[in-house]
């Protein structure tokens, strides 16, 4: 009788331990998943106008995974490559579940009408991809201090300067980066290189999976 009770006790104890182990494993994975990324800072506040002449603010991306870049429609160098690669990112998520904010660094020329033409020409179809224009000083402040992605104005298309980098934003409004093998962040994703786009798409998928937990 005592032996039977002891067996029942140890069986129950084993079951509890297994369940605790499974629970710990799930919880550990949830805590560990964000460690794949480094938080670089919070998204700055902004309200600008998109290609549909609608006011778009950072709060409109709340709860979404989104990507940021800086460009201008008359850019003769890296912008066509950047936009084509961003279209590839858009097309990797046909459910339109991610957001994209492309800030024009030539807002005087890039009116909502011109941005809408550019969107049609380049295959921009996602309702959550906003080509943004507005106050020039505000946009350069966002580029150089808000997102820390370099941009410099010019008088002609060849005089404008900007990086080809893409920034990744999580659902909490954090600017994030994946870690290199040495544990240091890559900071941003190279929007002109296939490898950078591949990494970006991989990391968006990881964030999407994490957000479902």
Positions of predicted regions on the chain:
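Short active-site neighborhood of thiol/selenol oxidoreductases, capturing the structured segment around
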Residues: 58-81, 85-86, 101
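Short loop/turn microsegments at loop-to-beta-strand junctions
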Residues: 43-44, 66, 163-164
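Structural microenvironment flanking redox-active thiols in thiol-disulfide oxidoreductases
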Residues: 82-142
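Thiol-/selenol-based redox modules, centered on thioredoxin-like
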Residues: 155-213
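Soluble extramembrane regions of membrane proteins in the secretory/endomembrane system
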Residues: 118-121, 127-138, 151, 162, ...
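N-terminal targeting signals for export/organelle localization
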Residues: 1-47, 207-213
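Hydrophobic alpha-helical segments, especially N-terminal targeting/anchoring helices
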Residues: 49-50, 169
């Amino acid at each position: 009788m005592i032996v039977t009770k002891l067996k029942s006790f140890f069986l129950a104890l084993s079951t509890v331990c297994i369940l605790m182990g499974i629970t710990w494993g799930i919880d550990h994975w949830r805590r560990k998943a964000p460690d794949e990324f480094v938080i670089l800072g919070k998204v700055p506040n902004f309200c600008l106008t998109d290609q549909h002449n609608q006011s778009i603010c950072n709060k409109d991306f709340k709860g979404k995974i989104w990507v940021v870049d800086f460009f201008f429609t008359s850019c003769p160098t890296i912008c066509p490559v950047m936009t084509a690669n961003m279209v590839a990112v858009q097309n990797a998520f046909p459910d339109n579940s991610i957001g994209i904010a492309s800030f024009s660094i030539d807002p005087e020329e890039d009116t909502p009408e011109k941005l809408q033409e550019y969107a049609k020409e380049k295959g921009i179809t996602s309702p959550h991809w906003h080509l943004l224009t507005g106050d020039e000083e505000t946009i350069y402040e966002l580029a150089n201090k808000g997102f820390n992605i370099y941009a410099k104005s010019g008088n002609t298309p060849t005089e404008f300067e900007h990086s080809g980098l893409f920034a990744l934003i999580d659902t909490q409004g954090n600017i994030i980066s994946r870690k290199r093998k040495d544990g240091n962040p890559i900071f941003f994703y190279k929007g002109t290189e296939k490898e950078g786009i591949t990494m970006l798409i991989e990391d968006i998928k990881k964030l999407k999976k994490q957000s479902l937990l």
